Amino acid sequence: MTFDEWLGLSKLPKIEARMLLQYVSEYTRVQLLTRGGEEMPDEIRQRADRLAQRRLNGEPVAYILGVREFYGRRFTVNPNVLIPRPETEHLVEAVLARLPENGRVWDLGTGSGAVAVTVALERPDAFVRASDISTPALETARKNAADLGARVEFAHGSWFDTDMPSERQWDIIVSNPPYIENGDKHLSQGDLRFEPQIALTDFSDGLSCIRTLAQGAPDRLAEGGFLLLEHGFDQGAAVRGVLAENGFSGVEILPDLAGLDRVTLGKYMKHLK
């Protein structure tokens, strides 16, 4: 069987089948195109078959390959961390647009470290901290920071209760917290079945972690600092209300490329609280 024949017989979408074949053959996309008529070595075909079956069983391609591209960089991912989504790049853009020179950023619930590492690489002058309650997730984030050459301080703990000081000093506090409501049908569908539930749902109404962040951020933000939160497409108004209730001013809801509510942010001004 040739490479092209395997691609043709695969039950996967062509783009996914090609990604798996590139992975097992270690060919580039161009090499695979030019060598498509060559016979597949048995070892490569057997590995490709095994990976294809994993994908047919629903396992995300990112977990099968162990990598996911985010903001133009390749991040290590595994079942201990949420797979970075393109929508989260809008959260990064919002952070970068508001980060002062030599600013301080704290990414809570960092997971793979995609947000923290990206901000640190895009703004080497900034001091970036990343924290997570999951030790395996922090190990993955540390690896990504090391592999990509990002300077990030890591802390372990639940939200603001970490093993590092959390005094008022942060220009930006950012998070993509668990925001799917407990029992949501999507948790048992598609890629979400394989991702860590603790990174997806708060096991409550989808807003409990957001409330915790909005309540705790004012005591950690510098005057004029920002809290930025990613959330579900139908949660914009609710998150805006949570931020307003906790003393944030100038609350904005930012859309993603599809025009859906995706990021809500607010500014902390002590004299307005």
Swiss-Prot record:
Tell me which CDD domains the record gives: AdoMet_MTases
Q: What domain of life?
A: Bacteria
Q: Name one GO biological process term.
A: methylation
Q: Where does S-adenosyl-L-methionine bind?
A: 109-113, 132, 159, 176
Residues the entry annotates as binding substrate: 176-179
Q: Which GO terms describe its molecular function?
A: nucleic acid binding; protein-(glutamine-N5) methyltransferase activity; protein-glutamine N-methyltransferase activity
Q: Which UniProt keywords apply?
A: Methyltransferase, S-adenosyl-L-methionine, Transferase
Q: Into which EC class is this enzyme placed?
A: transferase
Kindly give the PANTHER family that the UniProt entry links to this protein: HEMK METHYLTRANSFERASE, MTRF1L RELEASE FACTOR GLUTAMINE METHYLTRANSFERASE
| Family per record | Belongs to the protein N5-glutamine methyltransferase family. PrmC subfamily.
Name used for this protein in its record: Release factor glutamine methyltransferase
- Provide the taxonomic classification: Bacteria, Pseudomonadati, Pseudomonadota, Betaproteobacteria, Neisseriales
